[in-house]
Amino acid sequence: MSLNDFLAKSYGSKHGKEKTKKSKDKSSHRKSDESKRVTSRNIDIIDKANLITEENKKAASSNKTGKSLWKNLETEKLELVQHVDVDKKDDSKERMSSGAFAGLQTAEEMEKQIAEKEKLSMQKSGLLKKNQNTVYRDEKGKVIDGYEEELKLREKANLTAKVRKEEELKIRNIGEVQISKLDRKTEKSALLSTEDPLNQGNTLRGTNTSLLGRRLYEKNFPENRFGIVPGYRWDGVDRSNGFETKWFAKSHDIADQKIKEQTTNREF
């Protein structure tokens, strides 16, 4: 007998067999547990699916409740939900676009049929109300709060800016002709107020006064060198020695002579 055979008989073979048996037993136990769990889960799913189909078949056959069975994913419970057939039509008679049946009918019957259609459409709109609120998001996908208010404020600001621009353009486009017309209007209104006979009795309005606050003569008067206006009590008689008139005549003659000399001395 060799040494290897002796060691295998006395030590190696028994322990190896026991270890392999234990590992095999453990793996078989695990597989059986997992298979039991999977099968139990499958049975639960199949049972729930069978329940839903059976209940739906019952509701469809009876057609009294008009409800169908659905599973709520949040609570994980089966619930009955009212089923609304908005597009349901009567096969026996044809309906018009208003909802009334085609053919000879009374006014009351037509009103009833139209009211039924409106009621069904209202029910449909009531079901869709939950999904009517729009959600605004930015480029990264985050929800923007108060986006509609910001849009309204921007539109308001744009309108005010537009009005300002239009006013500025109007002011810029006003030329000298338009400005002169406006000035003439103001002058005409002032003349009308002075020439109005009702204003003649009003001594305080439209009176010429000096720097000291004294009333001045409002009609025509002869010129003088210093531009002094006579008082309002002057009777219009010139009582001077005629020096002012001679002075103005001489000054005009000197100015005329200067103009003549300038024109004759020019070389063409």
From Swiss-Prot:
InterPro entries: Bud13, CWC26_splicing_factor. Keywords: Coiled coil, Cytoplasm, mRNA processing, mRNA splicing, Nucleus, Spliceosome. Associated with the spliceosome. Residues 12-29 have a biased composition (Basic residues). Pfam families: Bud13 (PF09736). One of its GO terms (molecular function) is RNA binding. Belongs to the CWC26 family. Residues 104-170 form a coiled coil. This is Pre-mRNA-splicing factor CWC26. Residues 1-41 are annotated as: Disordered. Involved in pre-mRNA splicing. It is found in: Cytoplasm; Nucleus. GO terms for cellular component: cytoplasm; RES complex; U2-type spliceosomal complex.
